[in-house]
From Swiss-Prot:
GO MF terms held by the record: DNA-binding transcription factor activity; sequence-specific DNA binding
Protein name per UniProt: Heat stress transcription factor B-4d
Compartment(s) of residence: Nucleus
Task performed by this protein: Transcriptional regulator that specifically binds DNA of heat shock promoter elements (HSE).
Organism from which the protein derives: Oryza sativa subsp. japonica (Rice)
Predominant cellular place of this UniProt entry's protein: nucleus
């Protein structure tokens, strides 16, 4: 006689089988234990040392993945045999978790709360609509028997089975057996979440495009105002250019400094007539004018005598 533990539906059933294999008697029905995925997820979220990456929500009825890259790289390999965040989200969807906020990864389930680990057994996998259709025979028996003690769950890991569906079941460590239909059961929720994120991005893109169009219009209005209301600077006229040339023909800077430095003859220099910077009257001219004046006076006196 041997005690056999098998998983049927959502319960652990302990069976007692005789050596001849003719009759099997059910000894007891054990309360269903939570799925390994749920237990590990609860342990991962409840760890206070990783609150900067994943933590409980404000009401402690949700949990938030604050930094998905670090969550997938550093935390997932410690609890699961993969580091794929998308696969983790798909598994949450298969157990009825929903994404409640569009702009962050916050998930909720009515039986997944802080301090209520006993409620995890109330969370079950979703039944896919394709389960009613006939399925091909699995690559390994659906019910695996383990000769263990009466209430001990299996503790030693199994070797990876062969086959696509079996490999998926071993990869995520959800149950002892799985099928491709169950694995893809939560794809609709993930698609809805991604569609909502896509709509948010499109809305933000439209807002940025409208702001860009407004800035372009403002820029064009400023250019139009400057062209129609601001007069351009006129070029210098020809007279100004000519005066500049006459200034260049004037006395040199050295002569000006010498004339300014001379203490006497300032008034004479100012009254003197110049041509191209050269004085037309000098000392010889003064003497000549004095001689002419004296001759004129002599002529006047002779005429009077």
């Amino acid at each position: 006689m041997a005690f056999l533990v098998e998983r049927c539906g959502g319960e652990m059933v302990v069976s007692m089988e005789r050596s001849h294999g003719r009759s099997t008697t059910t000894a007891a029905a054990v309360t269903a234990a939570p799925a390994p995925f749920l237990s590990k997820t609860y342990q991962l979220v409840d760890d206070p040392s990783t609150d900067d990456v994943v933590s409980w929500g404000e009401d402690e009825a949700t949990f938030v993945v604050w930094r998905p890259p670090e969550f997938a790289r550093d935390l997932l390999p410690n609890y699961f045999k993969h580091n794929n965040f998308s696969s983790f989200v798909r598994q949450l969807n298969t157990y009825g978790f929903r994404k409640i906020v569009a702009d962050r990864w916050e998930f909720a389930n009515e039986f997944f709360r802080k301090g209520a680990k006993h409620l995890l057994s109330e969370i079950h996998r979703r039944k896919s609509s394709s389960c009613s259709q006939p399925q091909p025979p699995p690559p390994f028996p659906m019910h695996q028997h383990y000769p263990l003690s009466l209430f001990s769950p299996p503790t030693t890991p199994r070797s990876p089975p062969v086959g696509a569906a079996a490999a998926a079941a071993y990869h995520f460590q959800e149950e002892y057996c799985s099928s491709p239909a169950d694995y893809a059961g939560g794809g609709g929720d993930l698609l809805a979440a991604l569609s909502e994120d896509n709509r948010q991005l499109r809305r933000r893109n439209s807002l940025l495009l409208s702001e860009l169009a407004h800035m372009r219009k403002l820029y064009n209005d400023i250019i139009y105002f400057l062209q129609n209301h601001v007069e351009p600077v006129a070029p210098p006229p020809l007279a100004a250019a000519t005066s500049c040339r006459l200034v260049e023909l004037g006395p040199s800077t050295t002569e000006r400094r010498r004339c300014a430095a001379s203490p006497s003859g300032d008034n004479d220099d100012d009254a003197a007539v110049r041509l191209f910077g050269v004085r037309l009257d000098d000392d010889h001219g003064k003497k000549r004018r004095v001689q002419l004046v004296q001759e004129d006076e002599g002529d006047e006196q002779g005429s009077e005598g």
